[in-house]
Amino acid sequence: MAIEYLGLSSVEGPLVVLEGVQDAFYDEIVEFVVDHKTKKMGRIVELNEDKAIIQVFEGTENMSLDNTHTRLMGRPMEVTVSPEMLGRTFNGIGQPIDDMGPLISEDKRDVNGLPLNPVRREYPRNYIQTGISAIDGLTTLIRGQKLPIFSGNGLPHDQLAAQIVKQASLGGDSDEDFAIVFGAMGVKHDVADFFRKTFDENGVSDHVCMFLNLANDPVVERLITPKVALTVAEYLAFECNMHILVILTDMTSFAEALREVSSSRGEIPSRKGYPGYLYSELATIYERAGIVEGANGSVTQLPILTMPNDDITHPIPDLTGYITEGQIVLDRNLYGQSVYPPINVLPSLSRLMKDGIGEGYTRDDHQALANQLFASYAKVGEARNLASVIGEDELSPLDKKYLEFGREFEQRYIGQGTTENRTIQETLDLGWELLALLPRDELDRIDTKLIDFYYPKKNEA
């Protein structure tokens, strides 16, 4: 039964305080009626005896202390779910904003999700093809994995996210259902329009469910957007048996919104002013990826965050790295050389890659080829350091070959067009083509049988 109160005790930023509350519970949804006409929604974020602190999703502008009616709804925040959500666009709390009418469904789910029994989790296997060689070949995205992209201000992470949405698939041989849930937090209007236009023009909107929290939307809404997106993803994966890729951008906006709300509540700050529970808040989002026993679907996460001042030790990427299973790092130097996508493969890592590639998944040479490309590209750095001291002309013939390999690797393997969609076979074949620039005896990370089979014959001659 809903309980209604008249008046508020105080309004502080995105928060309101209500006293004399009875039978309320944490995370309970609240409805406000301001001046008998404007409706707003919120949720209880703190209870202290008979006092409740409530986050207001639409902001606290025009809320009167005397003439605001507050109704406790007696339930946690829920989002309406349906397979018909694919092809639709919603705001940060799951309300349609695409002029296609309301969502007709009686199914609702708690946005906090249900805890997954660890015993029922299945180990992530198989891969998701993004069509981008630096990811598919060297930091392969595995179904059920959480693999963040570490970017920086001004780097093309929005273009990369849009390209992945356009190209992502389960591979050429799979006939399983695949869809994408896209959540954007704190994005500008032009960026939101870019995503909409890109998805529409490339004909992928029908299998994308998009949640948009714009830069001028209430800060509090940013804290809900990833939870709403993941709730829909879990429904599609575990109840509709679909493989879902969740792309969340920008998790830095989420963390900054958390810091702002924490400051409004007067909490003691931790590192860089962020609350001490930033780690647990990030974990409640990232840990919702996975595969559940008995369900044919999976939830794979590809969160994107911008590192303040390109600092990978900043609390947001630092704590993210503790929770997730690797990272893909975008590099400003590569971007300055017009390499797109500017993925620095050496600090990038996919910890679950070994379990979803190779024979039966991609190709038997995949792991060894990736190891050799990593090792050879690392030697490129050594050769460049030596050339900066003694000059390129004084290098040995082998070092010059490594410099040539490095240039070709960055321009042809890492670099590719925004519309270029490579299959996993094309990515692996390109890797062998580039390794052919090096002498065969330099390929010390690959078994001889694989070299005999895949190493280009013309190079041996």
PLM region spans:
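P-loop NTPase nucleotide-binding/switch module
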Residues: 68-70, 77, 84, 96-146, ...
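Short glycine/serine/threonine-biased micro-segments
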Residues: 11, 90-92, 129, 135, ...
